[in-house]
Each structure stands twice: as structure tokens, then as C-alpha cells.
Amino acid sequence: MARITPIERYRNIGICAHVDAGKTTTTERVLFYTGLSHKIGEVHDGAATMDWMEQEQERGITITSAATTCFWKGMEGQFEDHRINIIDTPGHVDFTIEVERSLRVLDGAVLVLCGSSGVQPQTETVWRQMEKYAVPRIVFVNKMDRTGADFLYVVEQLKTRLGANAVPIHLAIGAEDDFEGVVDLIKMKAINWNASDQGMTFSYEEIPADMQDMAEEWRENLISEAAEANEELMDKYLEEGDLTEEEIKVGLRARTLANEIILCSCGSAFKNKGVQAVLDAVIEYLPSPTEVAAITGINDDKDESEGIRSADDEAPFSALAFKIATDPFVGTLTFFRVYSGVVQTGDSVYNPVKGKKERFGRIVQMHANDRQEIKEVRAGDIAAAIGLKDVTTGDTLCDAKHIITLERMEFPEPVISVAVEPRTLAAQEKMGIALGKLAAEDPSFRVATDDETGQTIISGMGELHLDILVERMKREFGVECNVGNPQVSYRETIRGTVEVEGKFIRQSGGKGQFGHVWLKMEPNEEGAGFEFVNEIVGGTVPKEFIPAVEKGCKEQMDSGVLAGYPLLDIKVTLYDGSFHDVDSNEIAFKVAASMGFRKGALEANPVILEPMMKVEVTTPEANMGDVVGDLNRRRGMIDGMDEGPAGSKIVNALVPLAEMFGYATDLRSATQGRASYSMEFQQYNEAPKLVAQKIMETR
């Protein structure tokens, strides 16, 4: 089957923003104007098409990235039909994983900002992710009808706070209640949208007289930026002082694709003004799959050489699975982006990450949560497959004869953990299945069982993240859970060296028990664990009983002497003892060794150890004092500070795990969400006396 839309007319874009910038409303308008939805859905009514989870409709925020496909011919019908694959992404900091994996497979993005609140902390996070994947982007300053809206102030913020070379292609006519439309700086005309038909029709008018000078000034800026694209344009601009509309667009497109400029437009999605102009900008200035760098991967050969897949239907098939979702009707949906080649329903492909073949049972095009079955997908397409068994987020799918492993996505380590247990014993198995499915969908969500407490511990990116997953277990899987606080896994060790006697003698007629040992106990090297040394000479303890002595000591390592936590890093030397010809046996020596070990551990200056986490906080310089002060209050040891991306600072510290609960929320409120952090286990350190005292009292 031939391709319906040429790949040059594809646009794979994400709509990204901070919470409440109006990005879902913007997407709803896009669906309305491109003819996909006949009635506009409003977020505040809980009726938005893209927010399809019950919780999203209740909370008015977007949790998962919904993918949809639409077609656009331009505001004036000036283009041939272009296919736009859109992914709507969440703006809440707990769901940055969704933004990260969307940007990995997109070619361009529209960043939506609020006209009154401008660049928000979460915008900085999203911006860093866009920079990481070098995604060409344009900005839509939304909510120009809001109190305090100021388009040029937001443009200035883009320059100062994000270091962006922001170039307006529109100017706002009026603001707040007086917002009427926009000035198109390329055409030098005012655009007014018709309120009576929800902005479906519009008219070009003369620029208001009081804005003429300002418009000319900003147009001059626009032309000079476009002229920087190449020598030919620059020469013409220097000679004639102007460029044609077409030349301006060519220059702006080249510089946008090179990530040298960020084009800015404005409007009010809620008032149906400006969204069609953004769609035109997507087509005119954002790349098709053939205009972005070809994807690279590792070939399946001895040298693991670099392989390249260009956006071509004739090339071998390659795709990246970027999201797994559970659908109540069809089971597992695997969202994937095709980078090269063609795949049809029923075809088998290879997953080099898992080393398994997979078969495409059904392929569907998604419109929010509505599915439309299709027979094939080609280079540049984004679709979902039903029936893939062992694919997880970030896996490559490719032609079995031309194996390539595309670069895997990086996912942040979870930063907050809680213990969960089902409300009824009968739900234990159901909870296990539910957690398994949720973990398969979301790589930033982890499930583990604590070996010591037996608790199921779930970990994620923040409290809201875990709240929503617990709520989903209840709604989608019918499992109600009690959520507790996780227990910190402390340890114990000894600091001194002692020689101790262990004696177990029971001789009162009949067969008795006799075991007698002398042990030397001392601290072992950090991380060396338990070490047993046999220095018996002359057979004072018979050879056959020595393994029992070691076993008796080893078993005592599992329960410490201060608070019952496992002991770490102890060296035990068996150097003397005695035995009885009749009454000595393995059990007697094992018990004698246990008693001696316990007595020795109590005498050898035992201490409690607490897990220390390596914490790395990325923060704007302005918040660094607050961040460092807070880490010090948490008994953290600052290891150093480095330069971070976009003028931020990175603070490295070693902090006790017990002090890190609630840190995600505290850091967010202290820095208005502008800082982010990662945390991993580093080592065990001796707990201060007061802390150790509290731990012993609570056991």
C-alpha cells in the first residue's frame, strides 16, 4: 500500500508546558480546527478529549501523554494536507518522565506559556529536557485575555531566564479583556478571529495606527534574524534593507531547525484566538522526519559498530517503543515511533534488547483514547501495537535480518518510597499483578519487597505520582491498599576488638552437651562482610565441629545486639577451645559459638549504622543558599558544588536516608519547583549517639 501523505508533509510534535499554561485547552482547539472533534472539550468541565483518565478529569491536570493524529491545510488552505502527530504531555514535576520519553521520539515541539505568569519553574525543567534532545521548538504565549497578560514581557523572560534567542512573529493587539487578535509581522496585517463561529473564520485587517511603529520595529528585528540564516539572504538584506515574505520564512525555518532562534506567537486558546496561526507555524517552521538527524544505534556485529537509520520507507524497519499503557478492553498497548522502513499487521519483528521475536497482532492509530485500526505504518509514523508480549519502554523493534539497537532512554531514579499492603489477604495476589502492570507502564515507578520487614515498597517521582498509582490500583484493578511509611534499613557493627569465651555444657546424666570455644572478634574492612578464620592447632576443637562454630557465628550476624538489625563487617577468629569425647557434637559447638559471639559483640563497642544517600541537587543559583541550609539541617555533609546546565548549580551531598523523607515536596516548595534532585545509596555510616538512642527506643 503506497504512502498517503509524503513523509515531507509529516510533523511529529509535542505540546509541552508548565501546569496551568493551558496546553490541553490548546490541544483541544487544534483537534477542533483540524476537524477531529466537532465539539470543543473544556478542561474545567472535565470533558477534554486528551485527558481521558478519570483522575485527569477530576484533578484537571494531564498525567499521561495522549497521542493523536490530525491533518492541516493552513488557515487559508494555502498548504497541501499535512499530517500532524501530536503528543500532549503533563506539566507537573512528578510526571516529567512522560515529557522525557515523548521528547525522545518527537521531531519538534510547541512550548505553551501563560501570558500572565510567563516562564515558570517547571518551564525550566521542560526546557532542559528539550535542550538535551535538541528539539526544534516554537513558543505559543497563551491566555492573553488574562489579567496581567503581557506578551513582550514573556518574550523578555524567555531571553533572561532560559537564555533563548526569542523572536516574535506576532504581536498582541490589546491584552486582558481588550485582547482582540494579533499582528502578523511577516504579512504586516492584523488578524481578527470571528467569535460567533468559535474562531473558525478570520479576517486580515490593517494594523491599528497606534501599533504601526512598534510593528515595524519588531518586523525589522524579525528580518535581521532571518537574514542570519545564510550569506545570500544577508547580502540581499544589506543591499536592499528588506526581504520578501518567502525569504523571511526560509531564513526563519533554517534557523529554527538549527535551534538558533525560538519563534514566538500569542493568543488565547480559550477565546479561540491564535491557535490556527500556531498550526501554520508548525508546518512552516518545524521539521519533517527527513529534516532531523538520522537516528543512530548499535549494529548486531562483533565490533558493535554504529548503525544509522534514515527516515526512508525502503530502509530496514526500525522503531522505538516509548510508552506502554494498559487498556481495559484490549490489554497492553505499546506506543512506538517508526524511524525507518514499513511494518504491517501480522509481521514479525525482533527486539534486540530482550533477544526475542515479537508479532504485530494489530496496529492502531490513537486519537486520545479512541482507536482506529490500520494495516501498516511507515517511517515517521507514531502508532500503538496490540499484542506485543515482552516489550518495555525504551526497547528497539527492528527487522530480524538487519538488527540494530537504538539508544535507550534514560529514566530518573525514583526519589520517594512508601510501603503498601492490601486491605484484605485475598487481594494480595491481585495487588502483585496490578503493581507489575503499573511498573511495566512507568519506568520511573519501582516495586520491591523488603527482605527484613516483608513489606511491599513502591517508589516513584513524588507523592502525587505515588498517590495516583495507588488510586489507579483501586480504580482499574479493584485493589484497595493501606499506605504506610517505609522503614529505614539500619545495620549494626563493632568498633573494638575482644577475646571472648563461649561455653555450652549440659551434663546431668545420660547423653549430655559439651561445646567450648575461644573467639577473637574485631571489625573487618568496610564492605568486606563476615569473615571466619580457623587458627586451631593441636585439635583442641576437632575438625568436624569447626563448620558448626562458623555457622553459629554467622547466624548471629543476622540479628544485632543493640536493636536487632543485621551486623556488618566483622572478622571472627577461632583460636582455642575444648571438647568432650562423648558429649561434644555439632549442635553444642554451634550454640557455644552463638553465645560467645553475642557476648563478644556486646563487649566490642557495638554501634548502629545508618544508610547514607548520595544526593545531587540541581538548583538555580538564587536558591542555592536555601538548598545547602536545608541539607545541613538534615544532617547532610556537603561534598562540593559544580556548574550545572543553563546557569544552574549542582550541590553534591551525603545525607542519611532517614532525613530524606518528604524531601521532594520540601525542595519543591523551597525553590518553587525550580530545583530537581537524584538520590542513590552510597554507604553505611555510624549514627550519632542521640539518633542511635532513638532507634533503639523505637525497636
Curated annotation (Swiss-Prot):
GO BP terms in the entry: ribosome disassembly
Give the CC-aspect GO terms. Answer: cytoplasm
Checking InterPro entries in the record gives: EFG_II, EFG_III, EFG_III/V, EFG_IV, EFG_V, EFG_V-like, EFTu-like_2, G_TR_CS
Keyword set includes GTP-binding:
yes
Coiled-coil regions listed: none
Q: Where in the cell is it found?
A: Cytoplasm
The residues listed in the UniProt record as binding GTP, with positions renumbered to this chain, are: 17-24, 88-92, 142-145
User: Which keywords belong to this entry?
Assistant: Cytoplasm, Elongation factor, GTP-binding, Nucleotide-binding, Protein biosynthesis
List, alphabetically, the SUPFAM superfamilies matched: EF-G C-terminal domain-like, P-loop containing nucleoside triphosphate hydrolases, Ribosomal protein S5 domain 2-like, Translation proteins
**Which residue numbers delimit the tr-type G domain?**
8-290
Pfam families to which the protein is assigned, alphabetical: EFG_C, EFG_III, EFG_IV, GTP_EFTU, GTP_EFTU_D2
Signal peptide: which range, if any?
none
Q: In Gene Ontology terms, what is one molecular function of this protein?
A: guanosine tetraphosphate binding
NCBIfam families attached to this UniProt entry: EF-G (TIGR00484), PRK12740.1-5 (NF009381), small_GTP (TIGR00231)
Q: Which family does it belong to?
A: Belongs to the TRAFAC class translation factor GTPase superfamily. Classic translation factor GTPase family. EF-G/EF-2 subfamily.
Which protein, by its recorded name, is this? Elongation factor G 2
Q: Which organism is it from?
A: Colwellia psychrerythraea (strain 34H / ATCC BAA-681) (Vibrio psychroerythus)
Tell me what gene encodes this.
fusA2
